């Protein structure tokens, strides 16, 4: 497996599993959050499969991803209510990109957090970008034990606590089959206190 997400960009939108994951995530999101008219940050947007779906119901979306190639593919979709930022999310990038200097009603992260070097620290930074009563929703591969690929329920719970979010949901949301293995996907939904 490559270390660079740029290497996956060209065929990403054609991958049936990636398409299915985005659709299942969107379906569960709209059951939990009324997205109509919301200002959204899609953190780790990739080529924007989830962003595209959100753009049909949300007001404005800022989509951020450190993969320049993936961000370029999303930009080429010319979604009128989407601003694309090709960068890592850091305090410095927030100061650098005017699109990130506002508060969001909803922040989503689809199959992102298990790849972060410091998930709790990143979630705390993301929480600072939410409006009071704003929603955080993430989907990540479920790890059965610490050290396995993905995130454990306990590590997600701990990150929600550290970031100050009130937990609304933390459960297996759906499963995906890869070869002979079924992999569960957690959904975590938190709300920033008023």
Language-model features: locations:
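Short alpha-helix
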Residues: 149-164
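Conserved class I S-adenosyl-L-methionine
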Residues: 1-34, 37-44, 73, 143-144
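Conserved beta-strand signature within the Rossmann-like core of class I S-adenosyl-L-methionine
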Residues: 133-141
């Amino acid at each position: 497996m490559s270390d660079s997400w740029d290497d996956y960009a060209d065929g990403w939108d054609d991958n049936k599993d990636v398409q299915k994951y985005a659709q299942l995530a969107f379906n569960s999101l709209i059951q939990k959050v009324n997205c109509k008219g919301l200002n959204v940050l899609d953190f780790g947007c990739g080529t924007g499969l989830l962003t595209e779906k959100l753009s049909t119901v949300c007001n404005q979306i800022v989509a951020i991803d450190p993969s320049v190639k993936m961000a370029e593919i999303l930009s080429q979709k010319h979604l009128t209510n989407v601003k694309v930022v090709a960068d890592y999310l850091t305090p410095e990038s927030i100061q650098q990109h005017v699109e990130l200097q506002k508060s969001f009603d909803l922040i989503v992260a689809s199959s992102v957090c298990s790849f972060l070097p410091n998930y709790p620290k990143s979630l705390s930074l993301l929480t600072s970008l939410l409006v009071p009563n704003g929603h955080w929703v993430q989907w990540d591969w479920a790890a059965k034990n610490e050290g396995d690929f993905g995130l454990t329920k306990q590590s997600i719970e701990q990150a929600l606590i550290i970031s100050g979010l009130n937990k609304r949901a933390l459960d297996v949301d759906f499963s995906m089959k890869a070869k002979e293995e079924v992999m569960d996907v957690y959904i975590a939904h938190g709300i920033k206190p008023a």
